[in-house]
Amino acid sequence: MRKLVVGSRRSKLALTQSRQFIDKLKAIDPSLEIEIKEIVTKGDLIVDKQLSKVGGKGLFVKEIQNELFNHGIDMAIHSLKDVPSVIPDGLTLGCIPDRENPYDAYIAKNHVPLNELPDNSIVGTSSLRRGAQILAKYPKLQIKWIRGNIDTRLNKLETEDYDAIILAAAGLKRMGWSDDIVTSYLDKETLIPAIGQGALGIECRSDDETLLSLLSKVHNQDVADCVTAERTFLTRMNGSCQVPIGGYATKEADGTIEFTGLIMSPDGKERYQHTVRGTDPVALGEEVTKVLNEQGAYEIIKALNEEQ
């Protein structure tokens, strides 16, 4: 096997999950020679704006995909929730490995439970999806935008006027943070996760058969089926980070997939949600799209996309 070059964002989390995935590949073939090439993306350069206000898709992947096209790298290890639902021609998701905790982690000063936060408490999040769901359930809380890596956000919780922050559990787990810092993990009844949250997507060139054969050995088809339902919903709804959209699928031992899709208005006042069960992940994503659009969810997306 030739020497492989992996493309990764420069963030601590991106580099950590890239190294962890490389370790999985080397467990299969210890003779593999793999190096990481760090790539700066547009999303990494935007530190003073809310991503939902920047517009566009693929803020954290476009530059990495260009490196794939130019043969500067052989594969890219993405957080799947950052990957637009349509993959460019010539590239493919070569594998979806095991999924980390897909839920959101709630971390509060003095570990005050979410349902006990006083009125007007400030909850920090970088996500419209999280903000809308929190406001729907707890309308007297305030949502305040927060950016930065995990360390930065935890520091802001301690030093600024935030009473709590919410971030993806998967990032905390991959970075080795102990459960002790988490006040609670928010299940899907409290907060429906982002599409693909907790999953990685390993992207490579569609014609790289040698690499695709290697990647197939660390592919998890059950996870792939679940994220296919989620990403089908994202595609059909024309969702992006400008839209409070969530979706989460699980697969049972008998092959049945349960998928819940969610669209909300940013203020949390409008909510469209539906759950379906079946065995065809694409059909499930399409069915939830159809139901939510019939209920009027497309009006929210249309209005938000027109604002950009």
Swiss-Prot record:
Required co-factors: dipyrromethane
Enzyme Commission code(s) on record: 2.5.1.61
Residues with S-(dipyrrolylmethanemethyl)cysteine modification: 241
Catalyzed reactions per annotation: 4 porphobilinogen + H2O = hydroxymethylbilane + 4 NH4(+)
Recorded superkingdom: Bacteria
Keyword Transferase belongs to the record: yes
GO process annotations (BP): protoporphyrinogen IX biosynthetic process
Note: The porphobilinogen subunits are added to the dipyrromethane group.
Oligomeric and partner information: Monomer.
Protein's UniProt name: Porphobilinogen deaminase
Originating species: Staphylococcus saprophyticus subsp. saprophyticus (strain ATCC 15305 / DSM 20229 / NCIMB 8711 / NCTC 7292 / S-41)
Gene name of the encoded protein: hemC
